[in-house]
């Protein structure tokens, strides 16, 4: 079941690069990020209500609709800030480079996460490192081989920063998620992303209602 869920997630993640690339031609990165994040919040809020009625919550969390409120707030803010920074860097990078290169460089967190884990005290086994190496080779063959060259220009640097920030976000989620309901943590972090990206959009860009409507189609 978990393998199927990961395959579905990766399919959505991969196809989103095309939508992000097209969307970057019509609106700024913060406007695009704000639109898709508010849409994610609305979806997750409805999903939380449905799952609550079905009784599917994290048994490790305390009772009540909003479970482990203090940890949820703290975790949501930390994860949300990291997700905002990573997503903004990704959207900026996608606007200046190819989607294939963006996919490869963003996915470098596959390498960075176990490396970060070593510094935090975990000891990945040989099997994991072999899987990491195979993943990087596979990503290169899928995204870049015979199609593009890898060079660190402006957009590529932004995508490298994006991979580092996604690594931090994954490590934060890994820290907080055992204590919380996963859907609620996702909602709070996307709410943080929505608020921050909306503020940045109005400060650094000139968003319009038409741009928000168009972005909903892309996301």
Regions found by a protein language model. Name each.
Residues 4-8:
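Short, small-residue-biased leader/transition segments that mark boundaries at the very start
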Residues 12, 16-17, 51-106, 139-141:
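Specific transmembrane alpha-helical segments of multi-pass solute transporters/efflux pumps
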């Amino acid at each position: 079941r978990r393998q199927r869920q990961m395959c579905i997630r990766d399919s959505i993640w991969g196809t989103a690069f095309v939508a992000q690339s097209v969307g970057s031609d019509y609106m700024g990165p913060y406007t695009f990020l704000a639109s898709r994040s508010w849409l994610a919040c609305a979806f997750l809020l409805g999903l939380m209500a449905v799952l609550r009625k079905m009784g599917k919550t994290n048994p490790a969390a305390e009772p009540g609709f909003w479970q482990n409120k203090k940890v949820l707030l703290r975790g949501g803010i930390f994860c949300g800030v990291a997700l905002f920074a990573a997503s903004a860097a990704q959207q900026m990078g996608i606007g200046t480079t190819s989607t294939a290169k963006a996919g490869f460089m963003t996915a470098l967190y596959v390498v960075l996460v176990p490396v970060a884990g070593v510094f935090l005290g975990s000891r990945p086994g040989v099997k994991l490192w072999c899987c990491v190496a195979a993943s990087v080779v596979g990503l290169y063959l899928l995204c870049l081989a015979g199609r593009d060259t890898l060079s660190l220009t402006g957009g590529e640097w932004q995508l490298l920063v994006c991979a580092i920030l996604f690594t931090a976000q994954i490590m934060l989620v890994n820290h907080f998620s055992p204590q919380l309901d996963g859907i609620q943590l996702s909602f709070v972090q996307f709410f943080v992303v929505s608020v921050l990206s909306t503020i940045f959009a109005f400060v650094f860009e000139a968003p319009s209602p038409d741009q928000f409507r168009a972005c909903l189609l892309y996301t």
